[in-house]
Each structure stands twice: as C-alpha cells, then as structure tokens.
Amino acid sequence: MVNDKILYDSCKTFNIDASSAQSLIESGANPLYEYDGETPLKAYVTKKNNNIKNDVVILLLSSVDYKNINDFDIFEYLCSDNIDIDLLKLLISKGIEINSIKNGINIVEKYATTSNPNIDVFKLLLDKGIPTCSNIQYGYNIIPIQCTDYIYFNWDDEFDYLDYDYTTDYDNRMGKTVLYYYIITRSQDGYVTSLDVINYLISHENEMCHYTYRERTILYYYVDKCDIKREIFDVLFDSNYSGNELMHILSIYLRKQYRKKNHKIDNYIVDKLLSAHDTFYILELCNSLRNNVIISSILKRYTDSIQDLLSEYVSYHTVYINVIKCMIREGAILYRFKHINKYFKRFDNRDPKVVEYILKNGNVVVNDDNIINIMPLFPTLFIHESEVLSILEICKPYIDDINKIDKHGRSILYYCIESHSVALIEWLIDNGADINITTTYGSTCIGICVIMAHACIPEIAEIYIKILEIILSKLPTIECIKKTVDYLSNDRHLLIGNKAKSLLKICIKYFILVDYKYICDTYPSYIEYITDCEKEIADMCQIKINGTDMLTVMYKLNKPTKKRYVNNPIFTDWANKQYKFYNQIIYNANRLIEQSKKIDNMIDEVSADNNRLSTLPLELRHLIFSYAFL
C-alpha cells in the first residue's frame, strides 16, 4: 500500500524514471492504484509534464497488460512538447480510445491548437479515420413547389410557386475544422504558421477551405487573426468564394490597420480579393465601410471604369454622399441631370440630402435635356411623404413636366391620391398638377378618391374625403366631371348606401359650380341638396371687393392678381366664415393669406436699405418671390 502511494506521488511530481518505476512495481506497487480518481499513469501524462518518458509510460502499461490504457490521456499528451509518434502508434495498436470528444473537440482538432504541430502526427491520426470536423452541419436548398390542388389568383408570373420545401445541401458544409482550429490559434505568442501543415491538411480534404463557421470561410479567419503571408493567402484563397465573402474578407483586412499597430496594407492582397469582383459586392462593401480612407484605398485598386461604377452606384438601393465624394476624388465625374435621373429610378432612393448634393455639385452637359424626371418616385404603394416633399422642393426648378403620365395614363398626382398623401397632393396642385387627367381605364382623380373613400376603413376613408374636397375645390372641367360620372356609374364599383350618397353630395356641390344645368339633369333626386348649396354660393357672390366677388377671386384670377385681394379686410373677414358645404374654399382662402404673409416676411428680410430689391415696386417684388418660393 505504501509503495502504491510512492509510485503515484512519483508520477504526479514527474520525479520518476523507468528503473525506479520497475523497482516499485516489483516491490508490490500497483499501477492500477487510484488516488483522488487518478492512476499513476493518468497523473503522469499531462501537458504540464514537459518530459514524458516513453519507457515509463510503456512500463506502467505493460505491467498490467495495458488494462489502464485509457488512463493515458491522449488529449493531454498531444498538448505536450515531446510527442513520440512511435508511442502513439503503439497506443493505437493496443486499442487506446482515439475517437472520443473532449470539451467539444476531437483529438485532431485539439492537436491543431498546439504551438507547432507535426504533419506526421496529423497523418497518423487522420489515416485512422478521425474526422476533420467533429461537429459538421449542412446547409439546405429551397425548392419551390407549384400549387395545383387549389385555385389561386396569379398576381404575377414570379409567384406561380406558392409553397416551398427544403433539402439538405451536402456541398454546404458548416463547422469548425482542423484547419480552422489551426488558423485561429496562430496569433498566440510562439505559435508557428506552417505552409506545409496547411498544404497537408488541404490535400487530405480538398473541401476543407470551403467549410464555413458562422458563415465565414477559413480565409476570413486567417486574414482576421494572423499576420498575412502571401504564399499562405494564395493557398487558402479560392476565386469561387462568393462575392459577398470576398468583400467581407477585404473589409476585415483593410480595417485591420486600425486595430493592429504596424499593420501595412499589401496591395497584392487587395488586388487578389478584387480580381474576382462583382460590382454589386464592391458597392455593398463601400456602403458598409463608411470610412473614406478605406473606401478610397479600394477605389484606387479598382481596375475597371470608376465613371461606370459611379453611374451604377447612384442607381443603387442605398446611396451615401461620402461614397460619391470618394469616387469623384478618384476621377469620376458627377453629372447633375443624368445621375439624378438614375438615382430616382431606384424606388427606394429618397434621401433629400443626396438629391441636393447631386444637384449642387453635378456637372451640366451642354446640349443635353437638362431636365429631371420625378415620375419614378411615385408608382409605389408607400410614399415617404416628408422625404418626397423635400425632394420636390429641391427639384422644383428642374422638373420637366409635373403632369407626365405613364403607360397607364396615371400622373404623379394620381399616384399620390392612391397613397393618400395629403401634403404631396396639396403641393402638386399648388404647383400646377392637373386634376383632370383620365387614365387609360377611364378613371379620374375624383373617381379614385370616391372609390377609395367608399371602400377603405373609416380612418383612411376620412383622409380620402379630405383629398376629394381638396381636388374638387380646384374645380374640374366639365369633361372631367362627365368622365367621372360615367366611371362611377359603372356597376363594378357598387357605390351603394348612405356612405355613397354622402360622397356623391361632396362631388355635386362642386360640380354645380362648373355646370349647374348638367348636374341638375344628371342628379334630379338631389335638387333639394343643390338648393341648399346655392345659398352659400349666393353668399360668396354677394361679398365683393371693388365689384369682384369671392368666387371670382378664388377661381378666375391668377396668383399674382389674387395678391391684390388677399390682404383686403373684406377678404380676410370672409375667410373667417364657417360654411356648411364649402369650408374647403374657406380653407383655400386662408392658405392664400398664409402664403402671402410668408412672402411678405421674406421680402422684409432681404430688402435692405438702398439695395436693388428694395427699389422695386412691392407688387413686383411679391411676384418675383411667389414664383421663386411658392
């Protein structure tokens, strides 16, 4: 019993050789003796022991016919500094467990984390069938399934497939490989990065470079963790990596200069990563970096046309001013109208700051159209009202045609009505948008308002009623009225019930201002309602300024002429009235008063004593400012 403890203590302190071990065993010491759960062999074989003696190990094993072979901790042994490959072969031949997992990794993966692993050890273990990845997972492929067992409406050919199935993609391997463990541990002090080891591991399994962990390749981790050597980079590099992955690798490489002192950018690496470039991924990278120095370093190595890259960028899904500036510094030319029109073609490009930058800094091409097509901003379901309104204000001097229509006969105003954007509708109408357009399907701005107000939930319907009043208060033409009446009379709209009647009344009260007889003939059942409306019309006609009644002021005079009336006390008193039917006209009158005050304030701010503006007649100054700012 005493000899058992002596043998254990000698092994625990590594103070033993083969002869002393032999003597203790012959004196009755038992190599299978356990103390605190450890046998002498287990206590002896540890990474703390820098001098594991083969003859001691073999003696402790052979003396008990290798019954204690699995007390030899192979994980600990592989972490020691003096591994003997012949001893490993002997242990394996005697049946030591080599396929176990400890702390989530197998023995090959564990060995890869040591400071200077030997190729022969890798070969011995891998040839025994130990996997290069102990926890491999696979991706999946999405397979669309065409639905045939029920009827559905085919909105678009792209949606013929309405269900999906998933199959395992065995080519998409995911997990931490031996090579991964080798690479990520090389940044530790004293750890060697060997090209021979890397070449051997890749030759053992060619696909090892294509395993990913957390969606990143081994090259990504090499660039991130290690001091880069060209020859190792070339071995790990594969042009078949996705463009997205290559750009992530380039990003982490270029950012490394800010994380690590004395890190110098090797243009060979940059060029290699850009060599298999796709423009889309380069633009994605530029947007993700938001660092002008790094962006410029990429653009300097970009071998294709920077001008073409800029043209593609301004039609990209997200555009940043700093990226445009970097491209300009590298020789690209920004064109005011060409590039702003490209910018608008992408439906989600709506940053007023970008628009303002392009318009202020873009070059003008001689003999070009020099016009802006704002139509692409609008055919979308959701319009970002404040952003688009700011863009319209910026682009106002350059808009070619505010009433341009698309192939369906729809104008910008029509699209804004569909998206129930009140502020945009008011702006468009104030700036000359035609309320009388008719689409190729026969609908009008008034008609679509009525239909949407009838069909939508109450909260949205209220907005459409407000829009309907705004449009009608501008008085449509009789042709537009007749087309609207025909369109709404179509059975497919099913405008029935009290809600439909109230909407029709809103239309009638403005229609009679255009053609009284036609409306009375068309809607004879509403004569009583029309009579009530006439009382308010008569009131507006009775209130006059120098013989001009309020209806004439609101509907028959142009803006500069209206200015002569809006500050008149008679007009301002009338604008304070409350009508039952025509309050929208009162609202429009108050807007005129507010706009006039706004212009007067601007004139006062810039009209200094004796400057040229101050010498002009007030009416002329007001005319200049109204065209410039309203």
UniProtKB/Swiss-Prot annotation:
Superkingdom to which the source organism belongs = Viruses
Under SUPFAM superfamilies, the record lists:
Ankyrin repeat
Description of what induces expression? Expressed in the early phase of the viral replicative cycle.
Q: Where are the ANK repeats?
A: 36-69, 70-100, 103-134, 174-210, 338-367, 408-437
Q: Write one Pfam family the protein is assigned to.
A: Ank_3
Any keyword Mitochondrion?
Answer: no
- Disulfide pairs here are none
Which BP terms does GO give this entry? symbiont-mediated suppression of host innate immune response
What are the alphabetically sorted keywords of the record?
ANK repeat, Early protein, Host-virus interaction, Inhibition of host innate immune response by virus, Repeat, Viral immunoevasion
The entry's family comment says: Belongs to the orthopoxvirus OPG025 family.
| Function recorded in the entry | Plays a role in the inhibition of host immune repsonse by counteracting the action of interferons on early events in the viral replication cycle.
Q: Which PANTHER family does the annotation name?
A: CYCLIN-DEPENDENT KINASE INHIBITOR 2C-RELATED, POLY [ADP-RIBOSE] POLYMERASE TANKYRASE
Q: How does it assemble?
A: Interacts with components of host SCF complex CUL1 and SKP1 and components of the cullin deneddylation/COP9 signalosome complex subunits COPS7A and COPS7B.
Q: What is this protein called?
A: Ankyrin repeat protein OPG025
Biological source species? Monkeypox virus
Give the gene name: OPG025
